[in-house]
């Protein structure tokens, strides 16, 4: 097999996005557009990937670190000029080079592999990836002769009325003989209205030299969708989301209403899990088998075990074991570690908290910077008071502890195994094993006093 290279064009500023974020870094289903492209290329046994960066170079390099080499295009003088920036990296090498735009997040490895194969079969010096669309307005047209051989690419604004009726378009993705590409790039002119160096001109140069130029037509236009504004970004996200969701459903996940379920590309979901509408699964979240996630839930960069039921709750950067009940309206903040058979009820919030097996936090509870043992019951309204206005401190609760309602555990504090905390207590000292901790004022009833109070009656 000949050497394979790839050049990814990612230098454009993307002014039509009207954004401070550089165009190719806008996310599509949890990943920057350009990273989608590079990740697909990386599956093709490519010997070297060179990403052409310009605006936002440092940020692009940060996202693609370890996946690509980089060359900076100091001035954006057109697509041919951009590819030419890789001259020091690639010129003179035997092999083939893919050229792909960094703003086409839907391009798939299988399509690029088919393009490479077709290029080899045709013994071409250049092969254009094309497709057919109903409304080709604005796209370069593929002009073929009577035998179907590619003659040239004509930009829409330069096309005759007859040529404008052609529906086969240039997608902006190419495969070139590497040596021929860089030799031709040296001869591209900027003698045009925009004063830029255009990559399609390489096709004309090769044709004028009687080299073989081919065109591989793909079935799906959506893979070639370039994102230049927020409308196209939304469309790319919609199409990518459909692709992601259909893949999960084929693998045994039930999406009750896939059109209203938002799952990032790196999320993993086990078989027979049910995801209701309005759920957002973000980042590198992993969900096990036989789970249920109900409407309005958001899970971000978290690991969820098997047979977990999440009811309208938020989970961020946390770990949840098997057979856990969460919600409704629970909030697991980062570094929560919920063990097996735990109940996290409504309006419960945890943060940097370990909750032991079989423990119940039924409702209206805050446990921050806390370590809670096994088979603990924490009553309604109880709080691990972890912040004194300056520093955070830790609360430790042993196994088989009962914490009565409306208890305040003032950290740092430790409650021993099998201890009881009386309802309404404010605990400021450690409670030993098997002890009853009670810290509240003695009730004093003032007999007859109520009649002296003005109740407005």
UniProtKB/Swiss-Prot annotation:
Protein name: Bifunctional protein GlmU
Similarity field: In the N-terminal section; belongs to the N-acetylglucosamine-1-phosphate uridyltransferase family. In the C-terminal section; belongs to the transferase hexapeptide repeat family.
Localization per Swiss-Prot or TrEMBL: Cytoplasm
Residues at which Mg(2+) binds: 103, 228
UniProt gene name: glmU
Binding site for acetyl-CoA: 386-387, 423, 440
Active-site residues from the entry: 363
Keyword list, A-Z: Acyltransferase, Cell shape, Cell wall biogenesis/degradation, Cytoplasm, Magnesium, Metal-binding, Multifunctional enzyme, Nucleotidyltransferase, Peptidoglycan synthesis, Repeat, Transferase
Disulfide bond annotation, renumbered to this chain: none
A GO CC annotation given for this chain: cytoplasm
Region (Pyrophosphorylase): 1-230
Gene3D superfamilies: Hexapeptide repeat proteins, Spore Coat Polysaccharide Biosynthesis Protein SpsA, Chain A
Catalytic activity: alpha-D-glucosamine 1-phosphate + acetyl-CoA = N-acetyl-alpha-D-glucosamine 1-phosphate + CoA + H(+); N-acetyl-alpha-D-glucosamine 1-phosphate + UTP + H(+) = UDP-N-acetyl-alpha-D-glucosamine + diphosphate
Co-factor binding comment: Binds 1 Mg(2+) ion per subunit.
Annotated GO biological process: cell morphogenesis; cell wall organization; lipid A biosynthetic process; peptidoglycan biosynthetic process; regulation of cell shape; UDP-N-acetylglucosamine biosynthetic process
Cofactor(s) recorded in Swiss-Prot or TrEMBL: Mg(2+)
Stretches for region Linker: 231-251
List of residues binding UDP-N-acetyl-alpha-D-glucosamine: 9-12, 23, 73, 78-79, 140, 155, 170, 228, 333, 351, 366, 377
E.C. number: 2.7.7.23, 2.3.1.157
Stretch list, region N-acetyltransferase: 252-457
PANTHER family: BIFUNCTIONAL PROTEIN GLMU (PTHR43584:SF3), NUCLEOTIDYL TRANSFERASE (PTHR43584)
A GO molecular-function annotation: glucosamine-1-phosphate N-acetyltransferase activity
Its biological purpose: Catalyzes the last two sequential reactions in the de novo biosynthetic pathway for UDP-N-acetylglucosamine (UDP-GlcNAc). The C-terminal domain catalyzes the transfer of acetyl group from acetyl coenzyme A to glucosamine-1-phosphate (GlcN-1-P) to produce N-acetylglucosamine-1-phosphate (GlcNAc-1-P), which is converted into UDP-GlcNAc by the transfer of uridine 5-monophosphate (from uridine 5-triphosphate), a reaction catalyzed by the N-terminal domain.
């Amino acid at each position: 097999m000949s050497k394979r290279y790839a050049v990814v064009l990612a230098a454009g500023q993307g002014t039509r996005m009207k954004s401070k974020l550089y165009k190719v870094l806008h996310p599509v289903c949890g990943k920057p557009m350009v990273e989608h492209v590079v990740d697909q290329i990386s599956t093709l046994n490519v010997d070297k990937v060179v990403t052409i960066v310009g605006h936002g170079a440092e940020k692009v390099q940060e996202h693609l670190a370890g996946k690509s080499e980089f060359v900076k295009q100091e001035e954006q003088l057109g697509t041919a000029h951009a590819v030419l920036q890789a001259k020091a990296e690639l010129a003179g090498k035997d092999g083939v080079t893919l050229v792909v735009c960094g703003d086409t997040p839907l391009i798939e490895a299988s399509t690029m592999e088919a393009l490479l194969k077709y290029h080899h079969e045709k013994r071409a010096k250049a092969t254009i990836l094309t497709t057919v669309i109903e409304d080709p307005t604005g796209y370069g047209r593929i002009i073929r002769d009577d035998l179907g051989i590619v003659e040239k690419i004509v930009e829409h604004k330069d096309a005759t009325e007859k040529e404008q009726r052609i529906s086969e378009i240039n997608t902006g993705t190419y495969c070139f003989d590497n040596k021929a590409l860089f030799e031709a790039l040296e001869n591209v002119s900027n003698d045009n209205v925009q004063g830029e160096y255009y990559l399609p001109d390489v096709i004309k140069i090769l044709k004028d030299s009687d080299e073989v130029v081919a065109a591989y037509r793909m079935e799906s236009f959506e893979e070639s969708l370039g994102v230049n504004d927020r409308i196209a970004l939304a469309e790319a996200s919609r199409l990518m989301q459909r692709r992601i969701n259909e893949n999960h459903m084929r693998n045994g996940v039930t999406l009750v209403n896939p059109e209203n379920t938002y799952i990032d590309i790196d999320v993993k979901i086990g078989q027979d899990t049910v995801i209701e509408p309005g759920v957002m699964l973000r980042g590198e979240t992993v969900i096990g088998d036989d789970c249920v996630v109900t409407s309005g839930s958001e899970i971000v960069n978290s690991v969820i075990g098997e047979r977990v039921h999440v009811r309208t709750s938020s989970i961020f950067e946390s770990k949840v074991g098997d057979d856990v009940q969460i919600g409704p309206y629970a909030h697991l903040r980062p570094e929560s570690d919920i063990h097996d058979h735990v109940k996290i009820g409504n309006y419960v919030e945890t943060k940097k908290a370990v909750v032991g097996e079989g423990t119940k936090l039924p409702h209206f509870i805050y446990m921050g910077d806390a370590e809670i043992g096994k088979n603990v019951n924490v009553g309604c309204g109880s709080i691990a008071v972890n912040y004194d206005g300056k520093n955070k401190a830790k609360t430790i609760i042993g196994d088989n502890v009962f914490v009565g309602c409306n208890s305040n555990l003032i950290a740092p504090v430790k409650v021993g195994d099998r201890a009881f905390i009386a309802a309404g207590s404010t605990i400021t000292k450690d409670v030993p094993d098997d002890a009853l901790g009670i810290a509240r004022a003695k009730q004093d009833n003032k007999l007859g006093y109520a009649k002296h109070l003005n109740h407005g009656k």
